[in-house]
Amino acid sequence: MRPADRAAQQVRPLTLTRNYTKHAEGSVLVEFGDTKVLCTATVEEGVPRFLKGQGQGWITAEYGMLPRSTHSRNAREAAKGKQGGRTLEIQRLIARSLRAAVDLKKLGEFTITLDCDVLQADGGTRTASISGACVALADALNKLVASGKLKANPMKGLVAAVSVGIVKGEALCDLEYVEDSAAETDMNVVMMEDGRMIEVQGTAEGEPFSHEELLALLDLARGGIETIFQAQKAALES
């Protein structure tokens, strides 16, 4: 039996609180059960050097965990003097995922930075970051249009992500930490609103998984992500 008696295909209780901070062009507190991530979108004029003069924008991301977002305190990476490999991998994933949602040519020479700070971790922090940052990004783009800095909204559609895995032989959606740590197979799936895949990251931690199990996990992820899309739309319409 899963924690909180969730069904195998069920996403944890999901909340997206917009305008959570007052300074950023977009800010969202996203909560998947006990996982809580603050996602902010910052708009700046100009682009990285490698894009100058090309008439297109850029979307990048940074990810971090508060020292006591986990069971025991982890030192800040700033205190260590460098970011860890996991952090770099996750923030690149967030940036890639959100760039897929935007027509960078229509964005013009603006850079949008998505900062995802984990306040409390209970599994699925990278997928929660993507789903929350998408809403923060949508708010930031809407403000660019409303201010007259952009003629049309360059957002092509929503992006959401969820974790799936096989735990004790059963395929489960949106893994909590206790499930993730015991999973035989762990997978993160990122999708566009139209159903196309942006990224699939899957690893067999113990027993290798079959082709049929892979397809079952992707179907499970699709259903969970559809629930997240509905929550994103409801938040943006509120």
From Swiss-Prot:
**InterPro entries per record:** ExoRNase_PH_dom1, ExoRNase_PH_dom2, ExoRNase_PH_dom2_sf, PNPase/RNase_PH_dom_sf, Ribosomal_Su5_D2-typ_SF, RNase_PH, RNase_PH_bac-type, RNase_PH_CS
Q: Which processes are annotated in GO (biological process)? A: rRNA catabolic process; rRNA processing; tRNA processing
Keywords carried by this UniProt record: Nucleotidyltransferase, RNA-binding, rRNA processing, Transferase, tRNA processing, tRNA-binding
Q: Where phosphate is bound, by residue?
A: 86, 124-126
Query: What domain of life is recorded for the organism?
Result: Bacteria
Write down the Pfam families for this protein, in alphabetical order: RNase_PH, RNase_PH_C
The coiled-coil regions, if any, are none
Question: What's the catalysed reaction?
Answer: tRNA(n+1) + phosphate = tRNA(n) + a ribonucleoside 5'-diphosphate
Q: Which GO terms describe its molecular function?
A: 3'-5'-RNA exonuclease activity; RNA binding; tRNA binding; tRNA nucleotidyltransferase activity
| Record-listed E.C. numbers | 2.7.7.56
Question: What does this protein do, in the record's words?
Answer: Phosphorolytic 3'-5' exoribonuclease that plays an important role in tRNA 3'-end maturation. Removes nucleotide residues following the 3'-CCA terminus of tRNAs; can also add nucleotides to the ends of RNA molecules by using nucleoside diphosphates as substrates, but this may not be physiologically important. Probably plays a role in initiation of 16S rRNA degradation (leading to ribosome degradation) during starvation.
Q: Which NCBIfam families match?
A: RNasePH
Q: How does it assemble?
A: Homohexameric ring arranged as a trimer of dimers.
Protein family according to the UniProt entry: Belongs to the RNase PH family.
Under which name does UniProt file this protein?
Ribonuclease PH
Taxonomic source organism:
Yersinia pestis
